Amino acid sequence: MLKLFSAFRKNKIWDFNGGIHPPEMKTQSNGTPLRQVPLAQRFVIPLKQHIGAEGELCVSVGDKVLRGQPLTRGRGKMLPVHAPTSGTVTAIAPHSTAHPSALAELSVIIDADGEDCWIPRDGWADYRSRRREELIERIHQFGVAGLGGAGFPTGVKLQGGGDKIETLIINAAECEPYITADDRLMQDCAAQVVEGIRILAHILQPREILIGIEDNKPQAISMLRAVLADSHDISLRVIPTKYPSGGAKQLTYILTGKQVPHGGRSSDIGVLMQNVGTAYAVKRAVIDGEPITERVVTLTGEAIARPGNVWARLGTPVRHLLNDAGFCPSADQMVIMGGPLMGFTLPWLDVPVVKITNCLLAPSANELGEPQEEQSCIRCSACADACPADLLPQQLYWFSKGQQHDKATTHNIADCIECGACAWVCPSNIPLVQYFRQEKAEIAAIRQEEKRAAEAKARFEARQARLEREKAARLERHKSAAVQPAAKDKDAIAAALARVKEKQAQATQPIVIKAGERPDNSAIIAAREARKAQARAKQAELQQTNDAATVADPRKTAVEAAIARAKARKLEQQQANAEPEEQVDPRKAAVEAAIARAKARKLEQQQANAEPEEQVDPRKAAVEAAIARAKARKLEQQQSNAEPEEQVDPRKAAVEAAIARAKARKLEQQQANAEPEEQVDPRKAAVEAAIARAKARKLEQQQTNAEPEEQVDPRKAAVAAAIARAQAKKAAQQKVVNED
């Protein structure tokens, strides 16, 4: 009794909510064995026949290929595709593929040569001696994908399972009403299917292996039991017929009682599922060394004269398969790829067979009935009762129509398996699955855009962070460069520090003077002499700078001399007219005059030794001197007529007169030494001299006629007479020079 209860608990199955029981139409095609189809003349092989990116092309137009030769390279999740037969690559171009919209995808077009030659095949009959990674890589490189309809790369799926898989489930339910591809494969190739299951078990090392099959396949069940008669590691579970019990989540719950978490995978609960056709493809890839180049396809429907299951080469046009089965199309004939509930209508028949093509249904007009017009939802909740995923299809329908993507996501539209049970029971004939597919596509597009925006933002923030780091590093370098002295500065600083240390050492070192000896002060004396020499050099340099600065323009010097003479005459007149407030000591005046003459001679010598910066034009100098004299006489006349406001110191006047005479002599020497650039007209010079003498006589008469207000000092008069005689001599010399 205990063994009976243990066996009952061991073989227990669970039931999922919802589901439907559509009419069974499997008997149309499951009664005849698998057969081969004649080769087509042209094959179209899309590069992408699986979930993921397409592989990298490794053939070119014009290449000769053999059956099983790779057309692309598979890296990562990129699954390679292989040539279905031998022939020549005639084109690599976009071509319409198995898609509801017949989207064009890049494809390799091969013209068959009819020989159907294989590449050299290397089978691994002793696969148990191979490492797990080697087997997974071989399965991946031989292009094996999920043949149940999803098309997920099998190698990637096995790699992702890892060591956490406890239960391996082989899906043999095949719940669609018309499809019998897996049923017929198990009837004809049960041993090969079981061998493929053992290879998968060797890779995953699960605790249990379960085969789930519906009870509407008695012949397949009997064949599997016969193969598994002597095996105790694989358990065959027969489950009730109910649509969609072949769904991955539904079959997992039926066999294990475990539910796949929302948004998760079956591997999260220790379960991995593979299709019957996938197990057979794994066997051929590992043991026989044959890449996947063909699969079993069900040809059924009342519009086909010879329904059944055939070995269809990948890339074979649908039209070729249907014509071989006796296709008799009507006026409005439709062809469905897949089952009537989860399949889609083909826009035309030139699309190729791919890895996920399991059925081609060509129903008659009476078989599917007249198309019904879509009506408004009546909120009957029949769709919610039939949903195997426990969703609310009527709410998802409203959210999909209203573009309310957030609410649709909140109501778990991603969990919809698109089984079509809701649309099957809908009394309003609403194509709910179409709305859900469109809504999921829009949500996927929105998420893709958000992902791109997030990546762009991350790149921008990374760039900003990089720029900030570079800026901070640049500022740090500048600070370091400013703080750290240059090499020369370092040397100077080091030398200064060395001198300071040496002086400190010398200062702290005691001086010992022995009896009878004199201290050695030679170093101190040498340092003192060096400082004196340095000071003298600086003083000489400063003196040279000052001497260079004192060398002025001769023309400016002539003007200044004329102005000085005018001031001297003005001062003499003021002193002659003014009464001295006090008597002047003759000795002091003589001393001051001698000092003034000495300063004047010194100034003349410095200017005579200095080289003039540029040659002076004698005519310009003479004109400027005449203008200066005229201005001086005019100023003298104005000042002689005006009453002096204050008394002038006679000593200061004598000094200024001596300085003026010195400047006048300097100007005469410069003009005498300067070489005239061009000859001066003697007549003009004589005229100017006559005019000057006339003006001088006129001025003397005016001064003679004027009544002196006060007595004139005899000494001042003598000085003025001497100045006048000097000016007369100068004028005479200038006249002689001009005449020569």
Swiss-Prot record:
Top-rank EC class of the record's enzyme: translocase
Location of region: Disordered: 602-716
Locations listed in the record: Cell inner membrane
Source organism superkingdom: Bacteria
Membrane topology of the entry: Peripheral membrane protein
CC annotations in GO: plasma membrane
A single GO molecular function term of this UniProt record: metal ion binding
Domain 4Fe-4S ferredoxin-type intervals: 369-397, 407-436
Gene3D superfamilies in UniProt: 3.30.70.20, NADH-ubiquinone oxidoreductase 51kDa subunit
Binding site for [4Fe-4S] cluster 2: C387, C416, C419, C422
Keywords: 4Fe-4S, Cell inner membrane, Cell membrane, Electron transport, Iron, Iron-sulfur, Membrane, Metal-binding, Repeat, Translocase, Transport
KW 4Fe-4S (keyword) present: yes
UniProt-listed InterPro entries: 4Fe4S_Fe-S-bd, 4Fe4S_Fe_S_CS, Ion_transpt_RnfC/RsxC, Nuo51_FMN-bd, Nuo51_FMN-bd_sf, RnfC_N, Soluble_ligand-bd
Cofactor entry: [4Fe-4S] cluster
Similarity comment: family membership: Belongs to the 4Fe4S bacterial-type ferredoxin family. RnfC subfamily.
Subunit structure: The complex is composed of six subunits: RsxA, RsxB, RsxC, RsxD, RsxE and RsxG.
Protein role: Part of a membrane-bound complex that couples electron transfer with translocation of ions across the membrane. Required to maintain the reduced state of SoxR.
Protein name: Ion-translocating oxidoreductase complex subunit C
Organism per entry: Escherichia coli (strain SE11)
Lineage of the organism: Bacteria, Pseudomonadati, Pseudomonadota, Gammaproteobacteria, Enterobacterales
